Amino acid sequence: FLLRRDQAAELFIVRHGDAIPEEDEIIPSGIYDDLPLSRIGREQAQALAERLSDARFDAMYSSPLLRCQQTAAPLAERLHMTPTLVPGIQEIRLGQIRPLPQGHEDVAALTQALKERQVDIVRIAGTNGHWDAIENSEPSKEFRRRVVTAMDEIASKHIGQRVIVFCHGGVINAYAAEVLGLEKDFFFPAANTSITVVRVAGKQRVLYVMNDIAHVRKHI
């Protein structure tokens, strides 16, 4: 059955914008799990803000990671809101996928390696349906439990309200899988700044919109 808006929390769940830098943007550091938005990602965040500028949200939440906070920023400024940071909706902690160049000189090679790493992550998770195939990662079931707990806790505070949550592709997959009753923890590639809408009332959850990217078609 469908949950009425006045009886449920309506979660607009948004994946962060693109965070794979081009050669002229990258700053070699040796640590690449909390990258800022790329030039494309910043454009996507602005497009999202333009699309949702007339919407009303009762609260705004974000993963603490930089790419999510930067995706939220343009909309937060338009709506005069401040995101609440929620550690439970951070992306899964992954082990090493592939070695990255250690030197700081060849930024072209580093940029290419980061792009290939992202492709590998989606390929491995998509093929297996979970994250345990990547050694030394956060266990897939524990990750899903963490995400569901955090999302449901957000929902419990906002029955009859609409909130927006900025998070990650793995997080969206885990929560959508729980809503749909799927065993897989990863089953689709969530697009950058895509919108997924779920209504939640306790343990009752209904998926209304999934992976909506109408505002960023120029980047497809």
What are the residue ranges of the model-derived segments?
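Acidic, low-complexity terminal tails and accessory targeting/binding regions
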Residues: 1-10, 84-85, 92-112, 156-162, ...
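Phosphate-coordination/substrate-recognition cap region in phosphate-metabolizing enzymes
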Residues: 4-6, 47-120
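Loop-to-helix element that buttresses phosphate recognition and phosphoryl-transfer chemistry
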Residues: 18-75, 136-148
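Short active-site segment of divalent metal-dependent hydrolases/proteases
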Residues: 19, 171-172
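Surface-exposed helix-capping loop/turn segments at secondary-structure junctions
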Residues: 54-59, 153-163
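Active-site signature of alpha/beta-hydrolase-fold catalytic machinery across serine-
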Residues: 74, 174-178
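Short glycine/proline- and acidic residue-enriched helix-loop micro-motifs
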Residues: 112-142
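Short basic (Lys/Arg) and small-residue
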Residues: 168
